[in-house]
Every structure is written in structure tokens, then in C-alpha cells.
Amino acid sequence: MELKVSLNPIHIKELEQNYINSNMPDVGVGDTVKIGVLITEGNKERVQFSEGVVISKNNNGLNTTVTVRRVLQGIGVERIYLVNSPKLKSFEILRRSKIRRSKLYYLRSRVGKATRLQQRFN
């Protein structure tokens, strides 16, 4: 005999609230951020920092992700971070930008000074 457990969406939301990272700043698309990720190498742990521009954000409750882009040595590098991951140790907003799009995928085809975004002062 199989035991079937059905969870209502209300119950799922309550369970997810326990795992949501509460010290996360309100990050938006176009923000330049510095992210510290916990890296395990053998039996040692260290925090690796990376910096870049948020080109997209997918709001999905516990599974919220941000895509961060940076050009390193002439090569564009994008990485998707799970915002509520326990591996994320620090998330700092360095500057905010004034944008009119929800996804900044057009930055992939831009080079040099064309990738700059207008800064927003609050």
C-alpha cells in the first residue's frame, strides 16, 4: 500500500519560508554586485568573490535566481546564482543602474564602453 501525501500550495509556501535567505538585499536587474560564494576544496572551505552586472532575475519564491555577467580577459562570463542558497555567504550591491528592460541580454553583443549603464542615484 502506497502512502500518498498531497501538499497544498499554501503548505509549500509555509515550508519555503524557513529556507528563504532573510539578509539578502533587494537586488534588481542592472545592479553591479559583489557575490561571495563558499567553495570547498578538499577539506578546506573558502569564500570566492566575483563581481558583475545582474542581467536577469527570475523571481520564483525559494528558487529565485540572478544571472551575473562580467568580462574577464576579453571573454564574457555569465553565472547563475541561486539567491537563497546556503553557499552564498555575502551579496553586496556596489551600484545601481537606470534601465528600461527586465532582461539585459543585449549586453552580450556589446563591447567595451558600450556595455556601460547609466548610474541611478537614490
From Swiss-Prot:
It comes from the Eukaryota. It is found in: Plastid, Chloroplast. The keyword Zinc does not apply. Keywords: Chloroplast, Plastid, Ribonucleoprotein, Ribosomal protein. GO terms for cellular component: chloroplast; mitochondrial large ribosomal subunit. One of its GO terms (biological process) is translation. Disulfide bonds: none annotated. Pfam families: Ribosomal_L19. The keyword Ribosomal protein applies. Its main location: plastid. InterPro entries: Ribosomal_bL19 (IPR001857), Ribosomal_bL19_CS (IPR018257), Ribosomal_bL19_sf (IPR038657), Translation_prot_SH3-like_sf (IPR008991). GO terms for molecular function: structural constituent of ribosome. PANTHER family: LARGE RIBOSOMAL SUBUNIT PROTEIN BL19M, RIBOSOMAL PROTEIN L19. Belongs to the bacterial ribosomal protein bL19 family. This is Large ribosomal subunit protein bL19c. It comes from Rhodomonas salina.
